[in-house]
Amino acid sequence: MRNTLLKPILSLSVLMGAGGYFTQGYAEDIVIVDGLWKISYIENDHAFRVNVLNEDGSARKCLFTRSASEAVYDNVAGESRTVTPASFADIKQTEEKVNDEFGTGTSYTFTFTRPDNGDDVQMVQRFCVYEENDFLITDLSIEGDEAIRSNYLAPVSVSQMYVLFSESEDNRMLKVPFDNDGWTRYNKYKMNTSMTSYEVTAWFNGETKEGIVIGAVDHDHWKNAISVEASDNGRVNVLKVYSGASTSETRDVLPHGKLKGPKISSARMFVGFADDWRTGMETFARANTMVQPMRDTWDKGTPFGWQSWGVLEKKNSFDADVEIADYYHEVLKPNGFVNSQGMQIIGIDSWDNLSTDERIKLCKEGGENGQTVGLYFTPFSWWWGWSDKMGSTQYTAEDCFLKVNGEPYSLGGAICLDPTHPGTKSWISTRIQEMKKQGFRFLKLDFTSHGMVQADSYYAKGVTTAMEAYNNGLSYLTKVVDEGDEPMFLSFSISPLFPYHYGNSRRVGCDTWADIGQTEYCMNAISGGWWTDLLYQYNDPDHLVMVGSGGWGSPKNCTLGENRARFTSGAVTGMMMVADNFALNDDSGNGDAALSRARAQEIMMNKDINEMADLGRSFMPVYGHKEHNGNADAAETCFMHHTEEYLYVAVFNYTDGESSGSIPLSGLDIALGDFDTVKELWSGETVVVDGEELSYKVPAKDVKVFRFHKKPGSGIADAMSEGGKDARLDVHILPGSNGGLEMNIDSSAPLRKIDVFDLQGRLLKSQNVRGLYNACVALSPVKGLLLLRACLQEGQVLLAKAMVH
């Protein structure tokens, strides 16, 4: 049962008076207990404290305390003001039922009025607790005249030290990069430094896996960040969770743009506590898709194919493209390098060097081979003449440039275009219509970060922030792309992580090539960002190269072990676009076609690895805090993924010497009796697991991939009851809100928890129901077989399957 305790309503009824307001300084603390959450407003501190509780109501963890939410705004006179709860004389606490993207629940609202600066404004903080989800949502608003402006709102703002975890070197803070440019990396810092993470972060203990996840679920107006100063491997000294980020890491020079009144709200912030922080990150991703579903328009399976930039680069040619496409169709496809739908992609990148007729012919011949042909486009970056006409308009490129401090602004050698400008949009429309007419159905979008720069102003009225401009431009682009019967696959390259819903895929890192250092860089992104494949249909490891062009990171003499490692990094990330020059008749000098074809025999024709890659999923780090060299920005070595039939475990070695070790089976979420055989997929050898650990030895610059075959009836393979014969479970699937689903569960015994998985074993939803016989689980749009695990109050587990058509 849900229990809400509002102490001030009882003890301060005289002071509160009509309307429920009371004067700060004369009140007791406000304490709200709702499910597993305890939200307190501490009067003496003029600040909030949020605790998570155990099932019995006892305290479990203080997530943050002395949080004096902070708003910076310009008043009607244009004067800059900063306010916190202590700035206001009065506070009113109310509650109301909510029914939004996250389900039904209660919104607890704190309204602060009569600021000491004399402005006619009020500050409002909401905490929303939901019946069907174990996270809470909070946001902060400043309200007043329509003339007010704000570019900084911090729903969580802590400036006094508190203990988050007991001191341990296993405690970590996750830094998520804003974009993937400049070889940015995910970091997992020990809790003895400062960092700023963008859009989301996690604090966790690597051994217990217990963790806190905080991040934004709205990405329409603001760039968001979480800044932390930590010490003593467990203490938080400063914590700011805010909308209004503007740093060199967001590619900005100007301060964040100001939003306009009369009501300005921060992004809604997800606050979650999880027994396993990795599950918490996945829950955060799914919470985002409740607000904005992913772009899942691609129905032709996991991308397997070729990409021209990895080796041919600027020396691409029509003849090489045709020869390579034929090689893929005639040799690689029959030998297993193809997805389960028989589809391959031929991706032509920048510097395609193709005439219009050659483009049309390449698409036609590819279609006859069952191949989808792709092209390259940079919608928001300009590399050409300033006086060039834009699309069908009379605007020149210069008319469309974004300006910073009055001057055209460039990143990486290209000038940034205003995504909202009609000239930019006409150019985008003209180019995309041309490509679609020529037959391209796969489009790589590069340098989209150029459209996410804070500028002096934007063409579109009402657009004042970089995030608004970016959304404006990409919503137009996807509208043009999706016109017609056959949508295009949109593959985002250099781009921000959020917003995510415009791309079918996104590169997990910057340019990534062939050698073991490139593999390590790719796996760094999966170590910290595997969960992003719940935002995108596919995570993209960039072009997979075996025999390079001879440039940095792309030597011609990589070892077979390095080839295996790089190929595997693609298989455990989500896409398989190999980029070698396989054209024997090409005389560009880039690559070595004969050697690449020889390597393809040993690497690309491994059907077990290709079958694993066809899952199109990113593998989860086994540990989450064991970087291979002890550095915060390094990759981990061990990754895993469960399906109904198999457990896959990939172990990388990024070093010059052999590595060996063992992984406890408990860390792989499998028991000794749950599987019958283990096969190492690169050697084909059967592996004997004697005790409670998987032992491994990996040669220098190489990888091992272990596949556990699950016994029938293990895990959630069969819809049968575990322990007890009397309990019964009935499941019904109904249409839900926002195109989603509602799973209605009727149980003959009181329920404690519901877990819903897809056929690959990925957790889609976990919901505590605490003693109910009936439960309704809201799901994002999904099709196929769903697997349900219902944990009863008495400890029994019931399993069921449900098909969604």
Label for each model-derived stretch:
Residues 719-805:
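C-terminal outer-membrane/trafficking sorting elements
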